[in-house]
């Protein structure tokens, strides 16, 4: 059987469905009328079109076909979807081209809003003027006399004009009540008005030949008969009434004019005006007028005030430091000149220029440092540096004398002998040896002044490299403090507090360099168990400069290790060593006042020290590791339990030779300080679980026994017996398989974890939407490119067509001219 072509099969199919062939057959006419309608015909055509165009249908074949299951989207019509997409893009492009270059907005057509040269008052005045113009053009006296409507029926009757929130009504506010007119004159005026109305009625209706009674009778008669008026009668009545009212108003105006002329002739109005002039209206002062009056008064006062003079601007820290350095250099030059005899005596003497007198900033700094020291003494009680006197009475008298001497020293100016030799400029030392050479020529009480002047002369903002030099100078001061603490002189400790304050100020800006220097000091002292007052000063500075509450600190942590090693490995066989150990324990307690980390060496040392001073044994755990040998020159005995809140001084740690009286006094003070330190340690460690075992030795100390029993009672009540951990019971492992009831083999994103399943679902949706968006963007870009190419081609075709048309027209004209030329030429040849 031969294979038929697709065109032939299409013709046969169309003919079979009665869509082609002869249509004017009589027998077929009845069949067509009773056959398919237009919708059926379109459906048949669409089926035939789909049948003969297999490329317009896309079917997604499945690997496994399951009967009875339809998958959505398995059959698609890419051609139709592409066509619909093209149409939608074409409509969107048309809308975009229509709106291209258009800018929407609201036009403000109010008076004066478009004029930027008018202020708000001018705008309101312009609006007011235009409103009055509209009123005058639409009503009032300019109305035609033949207008049928009344004056009160104009279109602008209900319109109200406002200005600054106040209504602008143009009614006359003339009130007769305040004119002083008596009742008789009022009655006379009422009679005049009544006569005027009566005269107007007579004149108006008489002129028109209309009787009011007759008009009323006609109206009543028509109302009684119930006959409807004709249009002509209604118009006549309206015209008559309008003319009547016009005539009435004209008569009233004439009557008023006559009365006015009569009053003018009798000089009545002049007398009335004089009476009105004599009446003084009471002025009402409102709150707004009072505010305006106060404003005007304040404005006049401001005008009369003197102009403020400009003050000097606030100077920066760098500028202040520069000025102070220049002052010091100038004073040093003057001092050198006076020393050489180059300056006259009447110019002033340098003996009166002491460091604390010549510069206010030094006094302010010292006062600030004293305040800072007082604040630090409140927080750091163990950092106080004072003497331990033989008895309390003597110490009180001595301290009173010292305070009196200090006040006298502050109130009186410095002596000539000390200030005359003190220079104003000093080189910044690079080592402790160089600093000793600089300060050796001056008294020790001038050391704070020397440090201040070095800081001012070498401020970090004055010269490059001064910051590093000051950091090195801070390290030199630390070495010098240790040097002063190790000296035997009593006066050395009086200036330590001032120098410590200077070091604390330098540590705020040079802490990294100082930390590295202190770590080197700690490493050098690590192998040595002997402690001097210099080491105690170093540990005190560490607690003042750095934070002791950090879990790990580059300086504090090594310092704590060195201090605990000293408490555990040193042999305390003398009063000075015991003082050094007690001072170290107090520093450690102060270190842990915030963090409260447990350091067992403190409690064990204090317990052993109290036992050695009282001559009793202790039952502390691991007590054998802390050796406290018998104290030389001291006979243990029952000490008087008298607590004190004073901290131990580091001065006695350097004293090697003590008298028996001093040993007795120091041992008593040592015992009191140890008991007080244990009390502070109990407050610090009262929350730890091992409190009863740690402070068991306090039962034998009367001052601490009650406190220990109270805290121990609560700690023992909080303890619970040791129990095993409670574990969750584990199920026995079984080999039975686990089935999922809602398992779906077609669901690729199945996951027993619901949260993870939701996450995967969101990711899949995001990926799908992203691919769809990218696909649409590509289609839009391709459509835009095709449209641009089509438009460019249309423009090019139009241009080429235009040029071809011009060329053709030119060629036509040239041909015509050429033919005319040839004809003329031929005719001339024939004439020859």
UniProtKB/Swiss-Prot annotation:
Instruction: Extract the InterPro entries matched here.
Output: Nop14
Task: Map out region (Disordered) in residue numbers.
Answer: 1-43, 301-334, 362-422, 807-832
Could you tell me where this protein is found in the cell?
Nucleus, Nucleolus
Superkingdom of source: Eukaryota
- State whether keyword rRNA processing applies: yes
Q: Where is the composition biased (Basic and acidic residues)?
A: 9-18, 815-825
Q: Which UniProt keywords apply?
A: Nucleus, Ribosome biogenesis, rRNA processing
Gene Ontology CC terms: Noc4p-Nop14p complex; nucleolus; small-subunit processome
In this chain, composition skew of type Acidic residues spans 362-395
Coiled-coil region: none
- One of the protein's GO biological processes: maturation of SSU-rRNA
Keyword Nucleus listed? The answer is: yes
- As given in the record, the signal peptide range reads none
Query: Which segments show compositional bias classed as Low complexity?
Result: 411-421
Gene Ontology molecular functions: snoRNA binding
Primary location: nucleus
Function in brief? Involved in nucleolar processing of pre-18S ribosomal RNA. Has a role in the nuclear export of 40S pre-ribosomal subunit to the cytoplasm.
In the record, the note on similarity to other proteins reads: Belongs to the NOP14 family.
Subunit structure, interactors included: Component of the ribosomal small subunit (SSU) processome.
Q: What is this protein called?
A: Probable nucleolar complex protein 14
Gene source species:
Yarrowia lipolytica (strain CLIB 122 / E 150)
Taxonomically, what lineage is the organism?
Eukaryota, Fungi, Dikarya, Ascomycota, Saccharomycotina
Gene responsible for this protein: NOP14
């Amino acid at each position: 059987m031969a294979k038929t072509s697709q065109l032939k099969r299409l013709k046969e199919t169309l003919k079979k469905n009665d869509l082609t062939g002869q249509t004017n057959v009589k027998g077929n006419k009845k069949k067509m009328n009773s056959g398919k309608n237009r919708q059926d015909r379109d459906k048949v055509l669409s089926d035939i079109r789909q049948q003969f165009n297999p490329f317009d249908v896309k079917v997604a074949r499945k690997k496994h076909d399951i009967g009875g299951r339809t998958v959505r989207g398995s059959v698609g019509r890419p051609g139709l979807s592409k066509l619909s997409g093209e149409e939608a893009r074409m409509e969107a492009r048309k809308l975009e081209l229509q709106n291209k270059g258009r800018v929407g907005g609201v036009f403000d057509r109010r008076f004066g809003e478009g004029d930027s040269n008018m202020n708000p008052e001018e705008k309101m005045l312009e609006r007011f003027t235009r409103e009055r113009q509209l009123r005058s053009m639409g009503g009032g006296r300019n109305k035609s006399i033949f207008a049928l409507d009344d004056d009160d029926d104009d279109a602008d009757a209900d319109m109200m004009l406002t200005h600054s929130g106040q209504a602008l009504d143009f009614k006359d506010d003339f009130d007769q009540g305040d004119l002083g007119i008596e009742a008789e004159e009022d009655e006379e005026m009422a009679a005049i008005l009544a006569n005027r109305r009566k005269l107007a009625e007579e004149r108006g209706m008489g002129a028109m030949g209309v009787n009011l009674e007759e008009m009323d009778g006609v109206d009543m008669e028509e109302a009684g008969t119930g006959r409807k008026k004709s249009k002509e009668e209604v118009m006549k009545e309206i015209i008559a009434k309008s003319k009547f009212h016009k005539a009435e108003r004209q008569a009233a105006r004439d009557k008023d004019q006559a009365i006015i002329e009569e009053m003018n002739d009798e000089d009545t109005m002049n007398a009335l005006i004089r009476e009105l002039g004599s009446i003084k209206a009471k002025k009402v002062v409102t709150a707004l007028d009072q505010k305006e009056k106060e404003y005007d008064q304040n404005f006049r006062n401001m005008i009369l005030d003197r102009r403020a003079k400009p003050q000097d601007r606030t100077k920066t820290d760098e500028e202040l430091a520069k000025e102070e350095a220049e002052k010091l250099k100038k004073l040093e030059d003057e001092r050198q000149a006076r020393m050489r005899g180059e300056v006259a005596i009447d110019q002033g003497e340098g003996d009166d220029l002491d460091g604390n007198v010549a510069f206010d900033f030094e006094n302010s700094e010292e006062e600030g440092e004293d305040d800072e020291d007082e604040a630090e003494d409140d927080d750091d009680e163990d950092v106080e540096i004072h003497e331990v006197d033989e008895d309390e009475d003597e110490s009180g008298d001595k301290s009173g004398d010292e305070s009196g001497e200090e006040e006298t020293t502050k109130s009186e100016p410095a002596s000539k002998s000390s200030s005359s030799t003190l220079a104003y400029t000093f080189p910044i030392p690079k080592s402790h040896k160089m600093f000793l050479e600089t300060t050796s020529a001056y008294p020790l009480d001038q050391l704070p002044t020397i440090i201040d002047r070095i800081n001012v002369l070498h401020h970090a903002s004055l010269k490059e490299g001064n910051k590093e030099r000051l950091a090195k100078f801070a390290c030199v001061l630390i070495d010098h403090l240790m040097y002063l603490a190790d000296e035997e002189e009593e006066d050395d400790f009086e200036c330590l507090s001032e120098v410590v304050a200077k070091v604390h100020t330098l540590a705020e800006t040079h802490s990294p360099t100082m930390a590295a220097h202190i770590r080197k000091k700690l490493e050098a002292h690590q192998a040595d168990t002997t402690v001097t007052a210099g080491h105690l000063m170093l540990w005190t500075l560490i607690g003042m400069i750095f934070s002791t509450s950090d879990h790990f600190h580059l300086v504090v942590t090594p310092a704590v290790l060195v201090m605990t090693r000293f408490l555990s490995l040193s042999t305390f066989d003398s009063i000075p060593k015991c003082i050094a150990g007690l001072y170290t324990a107090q520093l450690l307690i102060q270190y842990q006042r915030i963090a409260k980390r447990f350091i067992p060496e403190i409690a064990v040392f204090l317990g052993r020290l109290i036992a050695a001073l009282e001559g009793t044994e202790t039952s502390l755990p691991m007590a054998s590791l802390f050796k406290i040998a018998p104290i030389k020159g001291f006979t243990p005995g029952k000490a008087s339990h008298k607590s004190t809140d004073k901290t131990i001084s580091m001065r006695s740690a350097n004293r090697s030779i003590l008298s028996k009286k001093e040993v007795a006094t120091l041992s008593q003070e040592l015992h009191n300080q140890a008991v007080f330190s244990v009390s502070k340690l109990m407050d610090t460690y009262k929350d730890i679980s091992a409190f009863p075992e740690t402070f068991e030795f306090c039962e034998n100390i009367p001052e601490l026994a009650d406190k220990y029993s109270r805290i121990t009672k609560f700690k023992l009540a909080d303890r619970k017996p040791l129990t095993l951990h409670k574990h969750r019971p584990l199920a026995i492992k079984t080999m039975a398989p686990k089935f999922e009831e809602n398992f779906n083999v077609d669901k690729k994103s199945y996951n027993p974890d619901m949260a993870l399943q939701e996450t995967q679902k969101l990711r899949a949706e995001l990926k799908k939407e992203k691919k769809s968006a990218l696909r649409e963007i590509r289609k839009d870009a391709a459509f835009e490119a095709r449209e641009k190419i089509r438009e460019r081609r249309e423009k090019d075709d139009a241009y080429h067509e235009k040029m071809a048309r011009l060329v053709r027209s030119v060629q036509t004209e040239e041909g015509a001219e050429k033919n005319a030329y040839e004809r003329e030429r031929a005719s001339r040849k024939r004439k020859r």
